[in-house]
Amino acid sequence: LAAVGIDALVVGPGSSLTYFTGAEWWLSERFFGMVLFRAGDPVWVTPAFERDRALEQIRIGDDVRAWQEDASPWRLVAGALEDRGVATGSVGIEETMPFAFSDGIAQAAPAAQLTSGTPVTAGCRMVKDAHERALMHRAAEITRRAHRAVFASLREGTTVKEARSWCATAHRRLGVRG
């Protein structure tokens, strides 16, 4: 964060959240995500009715702020920025976050300078060590094997739904979700 001049980074559901934290969450109209700071643990924001599920997913940090249906998650994000002393700082928004989410943050934290979080997220994700490259090669090989099995089973009249199901089954037989 410091290297690119960002004081905090807001990351919602998706591949970046999973990559950085291991948390797997789906995108919906209700915000779940984290605010990552230059120093210290992240602050997590979750719908109150999802708090227990969120706690199962969260492996880093224990500051979890839950919002009720009649409240604003963006006020909790703004509060986290204020609590950490960066309410007027540069706040990166993860690149796949919906506009409605970033606009909500802008409205709740008008003094914050919102900017793209891509230099942080893409900057980290594009650097691969030997272990990560080996995992990627293994995943690609598993997928090739699964596709070969499916292609061998294809016949005239096979539906897309059937092929998808066969592909998922082939991945499971190879020990992964797919």
Description of each model-found segment:
Residues 3-17, 141-178:
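Active-site cores enriched in adjacent His and Asp/Glu residues with nearby glycine-rich loops
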Residues 1-145:
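A composition/biophysics-driven feature that prefers long, compositionally simple stretches
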